[in-house]
Regions:
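Short, charged recognition helix plus adjacent turn
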Residues: 2-14, 97-125
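A short, Lys/Arg-rich alpha-helix, primarily the initiator
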Residues: 19-53, 131-143
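The alpha-helix within a helix-turn-helix
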Residues: 47, 58, 86
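Key DNA-contact positions within bacterial/archaeal DNA-binding proteins
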Residues: 55, 66, 94
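Recognition helix of helix-turn-helix/homeodomain-like DNA-binding domains
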Residues: 58-77, 102-104
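Short, basic-rich loop-to-helix N-cap that marks the start of a DNA-contacting helix
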Residues: 74-87
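Long, compositionally biased
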Residues: 88-89, 113-142
Length: 144
């Protein structure tokens, strides 16, 4: 029987790294905790886990199916488009942060007004279009 290793959170890894006397030992002990998935692999995993079709994701993310297929084929979307995908996936804040990191973008930061509005939307189950309306009404850059 294959035993699944429990993944450590970022703070746990950071603390362990700070206390590590030997980098190689840290790297070897934590190999399973390092992210190696491409954005398209992570998106596919999230789609499957949430039972959402690509057509539905495109519609809920405010993008064309053609553009979505380009993302799944390896095209790197902008940070705003990644956030659109998060809303289309009904992602949790943690899932959104993971997808942003995986795509090479900064996490949402509550001290940034625009990010705070987006975080609120994710935490309160708002859809993309409601969040976009709120961003617009608050004179912040919309997601699309």
């Amino acid at each position: 029987m294959k035993m699944e290793v429990e993944r450590k959170n970022t703070d746990g890894l950071r603390n362990e790294l700070m206390d590590a006397p030997n980098l190689q030992a840290f790297l070897s002990a934590n190999e399973a905790n390092f992210s190696s998935e491409s954005a398209s692999m992570l998106l596919n995993e999230m789609l499957e886990r949430k039972g959402i079709s690509k057509a539905s994701l495109a519609k809920q993310s405010g993008m064309s199916e053609i553009y979505l297929h380009q993302i799944f084929a390896g095209r790197n979307p902008s940070r705003s488009r990644v956030l659109c995908l998060c809303f289309g996936l009904n992602a949790s804040l943690e899932e959104a942060q993971e997808l942003l990191r995986n795509c090479g973008y900064a996490e949402l930061y509550p001290k940034v007004r625009r990010d705070a509005i987006i975080i609120y939307g994710l935490l309160h189950g708002m859809d993309l279009f409601a969040v976009n309306d709120r961003l617009f009404s608050e004179d912040e850059e919309t997601l699309f």
